[in-house]
From Swiss-Prot:
This is Probable leucine--tRNA ligase, mitochondrial. It comes from Pongo abelii (Sumatran orangutan). InterPro entries: aa-tRNA-synth_I_CS, aa-tRNA-synth_Ia, Leu-tRNA-ligase, Leu_tRNA-synth_edit, M/V/L/I-tRNA-synth_anticd-bd, Rossmann-like_a/b/a_fold, tRNAsynth_Ia_anticodon-bd, Val/Leu/Ile-tRNA-synth_edit. The gene is LARS2. Its EC number is 6.1.1.4. NCBIfam families: leuS_bact. It catalyses: tRNA(Leu) + L-leucine + ATP = L-leucyl-tRNA(Leu) + AMP + diphosphate. The keyword ATP-binding applies. It is found in: Mitochondrion matrix. Its main location: mitochondrion. GO terms for biological process: leucyl-tRNA aminoacylation; mitochondrial translation.
Length: 903
């Protein structure tokens, strides 16, 4: 018996068997079986014919932990294998999963399992986007520290994910609010600062005048009032930190051409960035001939003509007129609403040293999102009119040659260059001097990352009265958050109140200084997390370059379409920056994107706009009405939320239907990019329940056939039965090909399930002789279970346990001593891939099948040749000769041609 135990391997721990009376008689030892698993084969050694809700639950209880343990034993260290990095967007730890989470993580889990079965080295990591405003609100409302609230939520949500049977690479778990993560967020910020890509300027914030604090946009209600105090929110200028994302606009716009798999998202990214045709240039400002130390950045679409500048224009809403600028009074004195106003302020171009006046424009809105632009009459008729109206001096700097070529004149070293060459040379020089020159659009703004919050990554800057803003030395990172005992939601940034933390020494001169009290936008934390997953425990750097280069780019990134613009833009920006810093070799972070749709619930709304709970709705009539008032209700499908009373608790539906059923429902109900209208009464849920039952029944028939005492003998099959088996072989290969394509190319997992349902339907029609004697049936049944396993891992694991111990198998290419999830993904048989020399072409006349004729393969896709071939065939002569044929139609998908004729 020792050799039998060795051969059983994996299943030896599950089952014991005795062989008595020959190889085809199986008896199972008596033993005490836990009550919760009395009905399943893996526990009892007896296959039950019925697949009930209790069976499903017993199967999942038995296999849940075992599947998890299998996954944890798979090594991710074998770099000789091709890799596959599947990443689903990590969640904010709100404390409870919703069905949207279940959908995205079911998709990523399914793809990860599939890729492992293909022999890929796979990571499917999970972590927590753990900083953010809700934790701080909880601190104010419930007197809970943000850290304890967050960690408690993470603990609960991790258990929820585990109960869903999701096998993440938990050893790679990251949490953005932990110092070992945000240390490296701070490190990257300092690298940006050193590269001139992080800077401060004044910007508008939402200000609560009662609580004396800054509000996030989501803390301002639809009436413009504070969520907490109810005060009318004011707009106030504060000095804020920005990341100069415009510096990478052109590179990121151009790189979209290298992302063919970003279906539907590339256009959104391109629109967000805009047409990158110009650049910003920096100016120093003077008033009445005196330098002020202040700077102004302005945009031009024609930087090559910068020597023809007549003025710099600002909008009436510009920060210089409303913030804390020393120029505000001089500018306001010059302002006449509704008129273009010349001011006493002069702007000195930091590249050309030209000095031109600042003009306040009459119009409030400039092009794109601009609030300042450079006036160049040589390239703008509007600028010409304004300069002439205000009597401003300027030079014509563009001359047109007889052949139409435009060249520069009166433009210092750029004189004589074509406009195109001058554009490149001048912007390059500006970038080299760090006075602008980054090619960008007139609509893209730099990224404001300052938040006047506690629960965020501290900005690692010290403000020194002597040295100015000074980055914290890298060896002193992380700058950790101080422990603040209570939160009131009043009085500005909580960090500003932590005097012991704020007051420090300047890293440069060692004099008295103060820490920056703003924290970073949480989008900064999530802009580089995909890198950290590749090397999550590295204490010396954000990630090891060689390790990141192996895993990157992410092969498939899955998340909601609502993140298709801002988050992806910021993530791409950080990846481009890290590439330029020689930290990684790949510029783009994500190869393929899958933007999954929402799961929507049904809502019932009164004419007043109030949403009702389902218990308040009378559904007995032809239209839903309010149970009390009998008012007619507006019925819609909307994103699930508590306020709309249309949410579904994932734990409740899993308890009711089982994990595999919910997984299959989510995957089958709609293509992943489409919305799902959650309604368990639709065809989708009954369909996947029936399909699981069919898989179980197919297995039962096969086990019974092989346990009948008869040995399988393929030579006993009749010609008709051999033809039946051949069709199963063809069907199996066709399904393998199509399902593999769905898993690797379009991710239409609903279509993959449909294909597998079709194969199970074909197998259920098989005759008893084919089931017993045909290797084709056995192979197709096993391939079906292997292909279904990534989507329904529990039920297929149980089925495979039953199949594994069926005696006298005819297929030797499966590894029977390991579970179904460790099988190799089925491959299409080479014979199936060989195109036949002759195709059997189905001929239809007026949509009625009339027979088939053999057509040479090289002719079968040519409409005209097939048409003539059919007419000259015996069938064509007999059925079509002398009849009026309008036109024939050759199917692009199948070997079929239809002849509409007039009798």
């Amino acid at each position: 018996m020792a050799s039998v135990w060795q051969r059983l391997g994996f299943y030896a721990s599950l089952l014991k068997r005795q062989l008595n009376g020959g190889p085809d008689v199986i008896k199972w030892e008596r033993r005490v079986i836990p009550g919760c698993t009395r009905s399943i084969y893996s526990a009892t050694g007896k296959w039950t014919k019925e697949y009930t809700l209790q069976t499903r639950k017993d199967v999942e209880k038995w296999w849940h932990q075992r599947i998890k343990e299998q996954a944890s034993k798979i090594s991710e260290a074998d770099k000789s294998k091709p890799k596959f990095y599947v990443l689903s967007m990590f969640p904010y730890p709100s404390g409870k999963l919703h069905m949207g989470h279940v959908r995205v993580y079911t998709i990523s889990d399914t793809i990860a399992r599939f890729q492992k079965m293909r022999g890929m080295q796979v990571i499917n990591p999970m972590g927590w986007d753990a900083f953010g405003l809700p934790a701080e609100n909880a601190a104010v409302e419930r007197n809970l520290h943000p850290e304890s609230w967050t960690q408690s939520n993470i603990k609960h949500m991790r258990k929820q994910l585990d109960r869903l049977g999701l096998c993440f690479s938990w050893d790679r778990e990251i949490t953005t609010c932990l110092p070992d993560y945000y240390k490296w967020t701070q490190y990257l910020f300092i690298k940006l600062y050193e590269a001139g890509l992080a800077y401060q300027k004044e910007a508008l914030v939402n200000w609560d005048p009662v609580d004396q604090t800054v509000l996030a946009n989501e803390q301002v209600d639809e009436h413009g009032c504070s969520w907490r105090s109810g005060a009318k929110v004011e707009q106030k200028y504060l000095r804020q930190w920005f990341i100069k994302t415009t510096a990478y606009a052109k590179a990121m716009q151009d790189a979209l051409a290298d992302l063919p798999e970003w279906y539907g998202i590339k256009g959104m990214q391109a629109h967000w960035i805009g047409d990158c045709v110009g650049c910003h240039l920096d100016f120093t400002l003077k008033v009445h001939g005196q330098a002020t130390g202040e700077k102004l950045t302005a945009y031009t679409a024609t930087p090559e003509a910068i020597y023809g500048t007549s003025h710099v224009a600002i909008s009436p809403s510009h920060r210089l007129l409303h913030g804390h600028s020393s120029l505000k009074e001089a500018l306001r004195m010059a302002l006449v609403p509704g008129k273009d106003c010349l001011t006493p302020v002069m702007a000195v171009n930091m590249l050309t040293q030209q000095e031109v006046p600042v003009v306040i424009l009459a119009k409030a809105d400039l092009e794109g999102s601009l609030d300042s632009k450079i006036g160049i009459p040589s390239t703008s008729s509007e600028d010409t009119i304004l300069a002439q109206t205000l009597g401003l001096a300027y030079s014509e700097v563009i001359e047109t040659l007889p052949d139409g070529t435009e060249r520069l004149s009166s433009s210092a070293e750029f004189t004589g260059m074509t406009r195109q060459d001058a554009f490149l040379a001048l912007t390059q020089k500006a970038r080299g001097k760090r006075v602008g020159g980054d090619v960008t659009s007139d609509k893209l703004k730099d990224w404001l990352i300052s938040r006047q919050r506690y629960w965020g990554t501290p900005i690692p800057i010290v403000h020194c009265p002597v040295c100015g803003p000074t980055p914290v030395p890298l060896e002193d990172l992380p700058v950790t958050l101080p422990n603040i005992a209570s939160f009131t939601g009043k009085g500005g940034s909580p960090l500003a109140m932590a005097s012991e933390w704020v007051n420090c020494s300047c890293p440069r001169c060692k004099g008295a200084a103060k820490r920056e009290t703003d924290t970073m936008d949480t989008f900064v934390d999530s802009a580089w997390y995909y890198f950290r997953y590749t090397d999550p425990h590295n204490p010396h750097s954000p990630f090891n370059t060689a390790v990141a280069d192996y895993w990157m780019p992410v092969d498939l990134y899955i998340g909601g379409k609502e993140h298709a613009v801002m988050h992806l833009f910021y993530a791409r920006f950080f990846s481009h920056f890290c590439h330029d810093q020689k930290m990684v070799k790949h510029r783009e972070p994500f190869h393929k994107l899958l933007a999954q749709g929402l799961i929507k619930g049904q809502t019932f709304r009164l004419p007043s706009g109030q949403y009702l709970q389902r218990e308040e709705v009378d559904l007995t009539g032809s239209v839903p009405v309010h149970a009390k008032t009998k008012e007619k209700l507006e019925v819609t499908w909307e994103k699930m939320s508590k306020s709309k009373h249309n949410g579904v608790d994932p734990e409740e539906v899993v308890e009711q239907y089982g994990i595999d059923t919910i997984r299959l429902y989510i995957l089958f109900a709609a293509p992943p990019e489409k919305d799902i209208l959650w309604d368990v009464k639709t065809d989708a849920l009954p369909g996947v329940l029936r399909w699981q039952q069919r898989l179980w029944t197919l297995t039962t028939r096969f086990i019974e056939a092989r346990a009948s005492g008869k040995s399988p003998q393929p030579q006993l099959l009749s010609n008709k039965e051999k033809a039946e088996a051949r069709k199963l072989w063809e069907y199996k290969n066709s399904v393998i090909s199509q399902v593999t394509t769905h898993f690797t190319e379009d991710f239409s997992l609903n279509s993959a399930i449909s294909q597998l349902m079709g194969l199970s339907g074909a197998l259920s029609q098989a005759s008893q002789s084919v089931i017993l004697h045909s290797p084709e049936f056995e192979d197709a049944l096993c391939a079906l279970m292997v292909m279904a396993a990534p989507m329904a891992p529990h039920v297929t694991s149980e089925i495979w346990a039953g199949l594994a111990l069926v005696p006298r198998k005819l297929c030797a290419h499966y590894t029977w001593d390991v579970s179904v999830l460790l099988q190799a993904w089925p491959a299409v048989d080479p014979e199936f891939l060989q195109e036949p020399e002759v195709v059997q072409m189905a001929v239809l006349i007026n949509n009625k099948a009339c027979g088939k004729i053999p057509v040479p393969q090289q002719v079968a896709r040519d409409q005209d040749k097939v048409h003539e071939f059919v007419l000259q065939s015996e069938l064509g002569v007999r059925l079509l000769q002398g009849r009026s044929i309008k036109k024939s139609f050759l199917s692009p998908r199948t070997a079929l041609i239809n002849f509409p004729v007039q009798d």
